[in-house]
Regions:
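Bacterial Sec-dependent N-terminal signal peptides
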Residues: 1-24
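Boundary/entry segment of secreted carbohydrate-active catalytic domains
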Residues: 21-72
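Functionally critical loop-and-helix segments that line ligand-binding/catalytic clefts
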Residues: 26-43, 55, 173, 177-235
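Structural recognition of the beta-strand scaffold that forms the well-ordered cores
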Residues: 43-45, 63-68, 93-98, 124-130, ...
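Acidic-and-aromatic substrate-binding clefts and catalytic sites of carbohydrate-active enzymes
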Residues: 44-54, 70-80, 99-108, 133-138, ...
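Acidic (Asp/Glu)-rich catalytic clusters
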Residues: 53-61, 80-92, 113-122
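Charged helix-capping and loop-helix junction motifs
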Residues: 79-82, 112, 140-145
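Catalytic domains of cell-wall/extracellular-matrix polysaccharide-remodeling enzymes
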Residues: 124-195
Length: 235
């Protein structure tokens, strides 16, 4: 989730943000036509980049918060525990994500993640942030299969895959991965349904502004409604 943001700083993109997430209409206007916005669920994803969050000031229409936990085989987000505990105490559906490194073994990345993340009933499944390309596409796919299977066996729930649209088309447009929930990052204002076989979460901007967080934050929709979101959580 941070590589895509870094790349986007190299180009000029204007995305307006408001403190009321449900009042913000993203550029992907097809979304308003194809979905009932009243039934969508709003969320943010955060890491140490957001620094100190004033949780009591966050907008009421935020339902879920996904928090960076680990990256590769060694890195642990320095704000994870604080953010994880605070999200739970403030009543949010919370999730943890791992930033996947393609040239690091899936086994060492799995050990890093489970050393930090202890999921409980009502938490979102683990999220795998896969956005770094590899010239060895087949190996990357096989390693991701191993990593996803390790997570599923350990947490007893099927992981969520986060990626951007080009990464999805190159690496995940394969029937094996259809079993997973997909969280797609796409800020270009194009029809997501025309290029994706399936998606459940949509990260529509990385330039969001909300009360309680200084600077920008990623904003997201879950498209199937609150009850459905609760249903995919850890039982």
């Amino acid at each position: 989730m941070n590589v895509l943001k870094t790349l986007l700083t190299l180009i000029l993109i204007t995305v307006s943000g408001t403190n009321n997430i449900s009042g913000e209409k993203p550029r992907n206007l097809f979304f308003l036509d194809s979905l009932d916005v009243k039934d969508t669920v709003h969320g943010i994803d955060i890491s140490f980049y957001q620094k100190k969050i004033q949780w009591h000031k966050l907008p009421n229409d935020i339902c879920f918060v996904v928090i960076k936990a680990t990256e590769g085989s060694k890195l642990k987000d320095t704000k994870f525990k604080e953010n994880w505990d605070s999200a739970g105490k403030n009543g949010y559906i919370r999730g943890a994500y791992h930033f996947y490194r393609p040239y690091v073994t899936p086994y060492s990345q799995f050990r890093n993640f489970i050393s930090v993340v202890k999921l409980k009933k009502g938490d979102l499944p683990p999220v795998v942030d896969a956005e770094i390309h590899s010239k060895y596409t087949k190996k990357l796919q096989n390693d991701l299969k191993i990593f996803l299977n390790l997570l599923e066996r350990y947490y007893k729930v099927k992981p969520i895959i986060y990626c951007n649209a080009p990464f999805y088309r190159k690496h995940f447009y394969h029937s094996y991965f259809d079993q997973y929930h997909f969280w797609i990052a796409d800020y270009r204002g194009k029809n997501l349904d025309s290029t994706m076989k399936m998606w459940d979460f949509w990260q529509y901007t990385c330039w969001g502004n909300v009360n309680g967080i200084k600077g920008y934050v990623d904003k997201n929709y879950y498209r199937w409604g609150y009850d459905s979101l609760k249903n995919i959580c850890v039982k």
